[in-house]
Structures are given as C-alpha cells and as structure tokens.
Amino acid sequence: MSDEVVLLDTWASMYGMRARIALAEKGVRYEYKEENLMNRSPLLLQMNPIHKKIPVLIHNGKPICESAIIVQYIDEVWNDKSPLMPSDPYKRSQARFWVDYIDKKIYDTWKKMWLSKGEEHEEGKKELISIFKQLEETLTDKPFYGDDTFGFVDLCLITFSSWFYTYETYGNFKMEEECPKLMAWVKRCMERETVSNTLPDAKKVYGLIVELQKTLESK
C-alpha cells in the first residue's frame, strides 16, 4: 500500500515551506491543503488540537506537528535519498541547536519590530540584524551549514529569505549590506530547484503583511 501524505499549510508560512522543501528533496508525493488561519478547518483542529497551528503533516492518518520535527520525521521515514540530518551525532546536536536558535529568535524579533514604533521599533530592528549577523558568523566560509551539502539548518533557515524584503522594508535596512555572506548563501540555496520552486515571491509576502497590518489596525 502506498503512503498517504497530506500537508496542512498556508502559502506564506516560512515554517510550512520547510515541510514542502523536505518533501521535494525526498521526492514524496502529497496532497496540499491550504489553510485559512482566520478560519481554521475542522481537520486542522482535529490534527493539531494542542497548538492549532500549521504546518501539520498527516502520514497515513497520523499527524506530525511543528516544522522542525516534521522535517526530521520526513528525513527518517524517507531515508533512501537526500539525507538532511548529519550522520555524526555531535553534528546532529549542533544542527538542532541552531534550528532551535532560529525558531526562538527570528519570528518573535521580527514581530516586535513590525508591531512597534519609535525606540522599541529600532531596538527590534537592531536585534533582528544581530541575529542574522550571528547566523552569518556561524556559517563561516562553508558553502552550507551542512558543510559541503544542503542540510537541516540550511533548509530551516532559507525559508525566512522569502520574508527578507518585508524585514528590510519595515526596518529600513538592506540585508545585502548587513550580511553579504549570508546573502551569498541564499543565492547558493536558490540554485536548488526544491528551494526556488517552493519559496513564494518576496513582494507577494510583503503585500500580505501590509494587508494583515491594515486588518489589525482596523480592529
């Protein structure tokens, strides 16, 4: 019996993009279901009753939640090609550390910058840039975070690049000027079809955020 794979997601989610890239890397066929986060589907609430968030991967009727966990699950289940996690236990631990850092830092700091003004906005902007500078420093002179190969950290970070234009526009800074090595890494990642075919247009993401802000301000 063939695997039944369903992904509950929304197009602009950098977390959902992770699952899509991982599935593409493994060549897994799946059904994509776009969720409206203002009106969550009964299936999403059933499959992720704790957090009620996307993405959710449903594999043969069983839900897997949280994007970093989903990517690791995909790597373990479809392990016959394109390994994403390092084989060395120490390198695996380091990869998990940096993905945890990414997940605890970037989105919350961006939100702080986005939803504030004046001094707090500037503080959020400086903090966001410092996070990317730290990630750039961690990359060192390697082509990828997985050394010579595209791996777990690369996959989990590259999805944020589709939001860089939004960060830059709201923060009035340029990633190319602040983090040139990181942007060179983005270009390398975008050479992979699994990445370039998954990431949405950056200006489309920005348009969504502008509309979302208008909605929030009207309430």
From Swiss-Prot:
Residues 88-216 form the GST C-terminal domain. Its EC number is 2.5.1.18. Transmembrane segments: none annotated. Pfam families: GST_C (PF00043), GST_N (PF02798). Glutathione binds at S13, I54, E66, S67. One of its GO terms (molecular function) is glutathione transferase activity. GO terms for cellular component: cytoplasm. It catalyses: RX + glutathione = an S-substituted glutathione + a halide anion + H(+). Keywords: Transferase. InterPro entries: Glutathione-S-Trfase_C-like, Glutathione-S-Trfase_C_sf, Glutathione_S-Trfase, Glutathione_S-Trfase_N, GST_C, GST_C_Tau, Omega/Tau-like, Thioredoxin-like_sf. Disulfide bonds: none annotated. Residues 3-82 form the GST N-terminal domain. Conjugation of reduced glutathione to a wide number of exogenous and endogenous hydrophobic electrophiles. Involved in the detoxification of certain herbicides. Homodimer. degradation; (R)-lactate from methylglyoxal: step 1/2. Belongs to the GST superfamily. HSP26 family. This is Glutathione S-transferase 3. The lineage of its organism: Eukaryota, Viridiplantae, Streptophyta, Embryophyta, Tracheophyta. The gene is GST3.
